[in-house]
A protein has these predicted regions:
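Structural signal for short hydrophobic segments within the conserved structured cores
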Residues: 38, 97-99, 130-133
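Thiol-based oxidoreductase modules, predominantly thioredoxin-like and allied folds used
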Residues: 70, 81-89, 93-108, 115
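A short beta-strand-turn-helix
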Residues: 40-64
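N-terminal targeting signals for export/organelle localization
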Residues: 1-43, 153
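Extracytoplasmic/secreted proteins, especially bacterial periplasmic and envelope-associated proteins
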Residues: 40, 44, 66-69, 80, ...
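C-type cytochrome heme c attachment motif
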Residues: 73-80, 120
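Non-catalytic, surface beta->alpha helical segment in thiol-disulfide oxidoreductase systems
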Residues: 117, 122-153
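Short pre-active-site segment immediately N-terminal to redox-active cysteine/selenocysteine motifs
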Residues: 63-66, 70-74, 117
Length: 153
């Protein structure tokens, strides 16, 4: 019985590692090309967007415009906005990168960016200052911000 359990454990570990090998970790580049919404942590934010610990004034670290969706799983308007954000990530794949931040899991990041209401979308152009949108807004309004703030057609 012990040999059987040990053999099954080894087989399970090998199977799990093999499954993982077939799914490469999403990076900023394949997020942009695949059109998926990526989860953003505080550490990744400091690396890819803005290191607020090193810089006092805004200095964007990316090379494509970014939308960051600050949300919470318990927030009704956040759940309404989520499919729209997913759709826009697909529509503008390769032109913008879309991230999401669960403010319950990343409270330091939310505080550091001054997020006080949910949902909050942060539109970050390659050059210039970020702009925010608070609340569940229509898709047309978000597309207008993509065109006017992020300068993406």
């Amino acid at each position: 019985m012990k040999k059987f359990l040990f053999s099954m454990s080894v087989a399970l570990v090998l199977l799990m590692s093999n499954c993982h090998a077939g799914n490469p970790a999403k990076t900023k580049d394949n997020a942009a090309t695949s059109g998926s919404v990526m989860v953003l942590t505080n550490d990744l934010f400091k690396q890819k967007i803005f290191n607020y610990e090193l810089n006092k004034s805004w200095k964007f670290e990316g090379n494509l415009p970014v939308i960051i969706d600050f949300y919470a799983t318990w927030c009704g308007p956040c759940r309404m906005l989520s499919p729209i954000v997913e759709e826009l990530a697909g529509k503008y794949a390769g032109k913008i990168i879309v991230y999401k931040v669960d403010t319950d899991k990343e409270p330091l990041l939310a505080r550091s960016m001054g997020i006080q209401s949910l949902p909050t979308l942060l539109f970050i152009p390659v050059k210039g200052q970020p702009h925010s949108s608070i609340g569940a807004v229509p898709k047309e309004t978000l597309e207008k911000a993509i065109h006017e703030v992020l300068l993406v057609k």
